[in-house]
Amino acid sequence: MNAQSPDGAPQDERTAELAARLERVHQRIEDASRRAAREKPELIVVTKFHPAEDVRRLYSLGVREVGENRDQEASAKASELVDLEGLSWHFIGQLQSNKARSVVRYASAVHSVDRDSIATALSRAVLGERENGGRADLDVLLQVNLDPAAEEQTRRGGALPASLPALADHVAVLEGLRLRGLMAVAPLGADPRPAFEWLHRLSGELQAAHPEATLLSAGMSHDLEDAIACGATHLRIGTDVLGPRPPMG
């Protein structure tokens, strides 16, 4: 039988594996930040497809920011892990308006707002939750499409850059939301550096109109160094911390 830490996390080979992986990622972040002469960004560990037990293990290793792509999975994990004080859930996947009410029950931030209707739905959901308790404002990042020339079926979501000013203005006046910055994914199969440099310029333009929108969510396992060099404040790292997706069933 595996022993457990005081917070309920199993002390086993998997915990040791996660600790080693996490240490390697932290070292990459530290090295890249030093080379770029930038402050170390926050690490969001993307736990999609991995069990709640792994999130508990990560918590025991000091992780307090986790990211999820699918509401059904995230909601179940958040409910199971409600005892983990200070654990913050970031919703980073494509969001449908009819899922907004569920998402605001557990998420501290949504990184994937790319149209007015999603923002409006989130605002209404936050206000609805406030009727039942003390729901704080929801941090919102606008997802920008850095590959607008891509075929529709290959896009990873996001607002076109030209539409960002109007979307930002819309979010900024919605009650219950805090406009905090931008999120993007580098185009598939392309050098991420030019895309992240573009994202950094867009971030500067956004901050000129909305000074509080200082966050830049960019960089995953394969391109975190480029993201850091271009000013990322938050990294979304999954595979390099958790390993390959576990088998289904």
Can you name each region flagged by the protein language model?
Residues 2-222, 228-230, 242-244:
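Conserved alpha/beta-domain cores
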Residues 232-249:
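Gly/Pro- and small hydrophobic-enriched strand-loop and loop-to-helix capping segments
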